[in-house]
Amino acid sequence: MQERPLGSTGISVSELGLGTWGLSGDGYSPLPEADQDAVIERALALGVTLFDTADSYGKGAMEARLGERLAAHPQAVIVTKLGTDREASPARKRFDPTFIRESFERSRERLKRDVIDIVLLHNPSDSTLARGEAGAVLQELQNAGRIRAWGASVEGVDTARIAIHQGIKVLEVAYNAFHSRTMQHLEVEIRNQNVGILAHSVLAHGLLCGQWPFDKQFANNDHRSERWTGDDLRRRISQLNAIRPCVNGSTVTSLRAAALRYVLSNDLVSCAVLGPRSSLQLDQLIREAGRDPYLSPEALGALQIRLDNLKASA
């Protein structure tokens, strides 16, 4: 497993990380704890060093799970996210200083860590970031040696830009072949500020694996049932043809491999956060990710032209 620097934080992380939202059962069907443990243990065995979670995943249960499984692995880098008041009905976003401090202490206890490696604000609004109160709390915790680095997990170009201008050192964003706008629009700022990028949704929730029929149906408790309309999904599946020429049968053996290698080919990405729900899926992803060069310059350039043409015709 190759490692990359996490921006200017001084932290090195495996270029493939384990995301735990899918393991928590949120957005999908529940997963037995034994299956969760198996994926975490397999990730460790394969050299994964970054584990991404949030205090809201499984209502805190996923943090506790990682705390148990990683207790004997202090070298593992844990990323957690704060900012969801799960005691409210319904749950709501909350970023006032008192709540952030209390949430941090609860996460620290569940994770069994005196020092948490990376803490991110979890989908804060533009106004929350602009006020800077929540970020100031995390900076105080970093100054006190309670966390090693902090940042934000955000949606959208404008919010990401505000976060960067606020001086955050770590940014988590969705990034894949069909969702690259944030990274493309903010490339200069990210590079100039040396921001560490954690890329999630790298396979677009399974779409980029290329294994769905046009009439794919999702269970009612699967978040993807509300993510796309039938027409949207059929259009997206047809657009996979833009990626298929990257599959060469030797180094790039599947559409899934091509999509993952597209993300890893971007040197701004510190870590591609995977979301497997089984050890088998994790094995496949890590095997197919390969090593640098992930896609040849010619293949990558031609792919980007095809993707740009898709956006132009949308």
Summary of predicted features, one role per range:
Residues 1-77:
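N-terminal binding-site loop/beta-alpha segment at the start of enzyme catalytic domains
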Residues 52-53, 66, 80, 152, ...:
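Hydrophobic residues in well-ordered beta-strands that form the structural core
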Residues 11-16, 47-50, 72-76, 113-117, ...:
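Short, well-ordered coil/turn segments that N-cap beta-strands
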Residues 3, 124-312:
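Beta/alpha (TIM)-barrel catalytic core signal, keyed to glycine-rich beta->alpha loops juxtaposed to Asp/Glu
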Residues 75-88, 119:
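A short, structured active-site edge motif that brings together acidic residues
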Residues 21-34, 86-101, 127:
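Active-site mouth loops of central-metabolism enzymes
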Residues 108-127:
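Active-site groove signature of glycoside hydrolases
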